[in-house]
Amino acid sequence: ILLILFVSINFYVHAQVDSLFQVPGTHCSMLPPKGFDKAETFSGFQQPNTGSSIMITELPTNYMVIVNSFTAESLAKAGLLLMSSDTLIFNGMTAYTYYIKQKANEVTFNKQVFIFGNNQLAVMVNGMYPEKETAVGEIILSSMKSVIYNETTAENGKEAVKFALDPTGTSMIYSGYLSGALMYSQDGKMPTQSADKAVFTVGSSFSSVAIDDTKAYTESRIKSLPYAEKTVIKTITPVTIYNINGYEIVAEGSDKENQQQLIYFVMLYPDNTSYYIMLGMTNAKYESYLSDFRKLAQTFMLK
């Protein structure tokens, strides 16, 4: 799952700040890289003319789980080449560092990745830049080394995105922010600990993508979800939310424990190069949660 964090390549940017900046959606502050602006679709910074970026991701899991997944073999399966790995002392903690290469659209990108945390939290700082942009790479690495984690700082996840939902009148409670997406669950925890495993997520595209047939694209995206080989689409219906057209899919499938689950899936297309995506899942009370998922989706709005 973590490997999908590396695939976004096209970004926008511009700015210079000489003081620590709290990165929205995280508990981290850092010196913004020179010539970069705050990203609009993820937690971090981006630069337009080079396609470079720094992304910070916080995950509610033991950081060694993430470290152990960064093997040459697993990265290679995602088209990533591990060049080297090391450790460094980072704000009093041990950080695992990785130097990775990836080719996309005939361009080779270098990636510098820091992973640190504790037995309950993993923080991943991912810097990416074209191989030929060595000066930009030095700026990114310097900025990455300035990251400071403060658990008492509010994550401000809702401020990190340009959309909003209102769960009032539903069983869903805001549970957190992850990689540009707002998360909701029945118990307000991430990951959820409720027996029904009911969750709802809303996010957006990271970069431009050519979309010729929005219906076909929606179907292809639901079929790309984890364990989608057992997913059966029950209905697919045109939908308009906040004056943005798209499609709603109701499906049934299985989770990683092979338990049956309801899948509610919505994609909205403001144009042919971007989208907003909403996903609701539950292992029980299908009719009740389907009603809640639909009600929550209908509150989607842009800020």
Question: Language-model features: where?
Answer:
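Surface-exposed amphipathic alpha-helical segments
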Residues: 16, 25-26, 32-38, 125-173, ...
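Secretory pathway targeting signatures of secreted, lumenal, and periplasmic proteins
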Residues: 19-69, 107, 164-222, 255-258
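Short, well-ordered beta-strand elements
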Residues: 54-57, 121-131, 200-203, 264, ...
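Signature of long, low-cysteine stretches enriched in small and polar/charged residues
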Residues: 20-22, 31-37, 44, 73-119, ...
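Hydrophobic beta-strand residues in large extracellular and virion-surface proteins
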Residues: 54-56, 98, 114, 184, ...
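Surface-exposed flexible segments
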Residues: 63-79, 135-146, 196-208, 285-301
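Bacterial Sec-dependent N-terminal signal peptides
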Residues: 1-19, 300
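Long, acidic/polar, low-complexity amphipathic helices and coiled-coil-like
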Residues: 44-54, 94, 99-145, 149
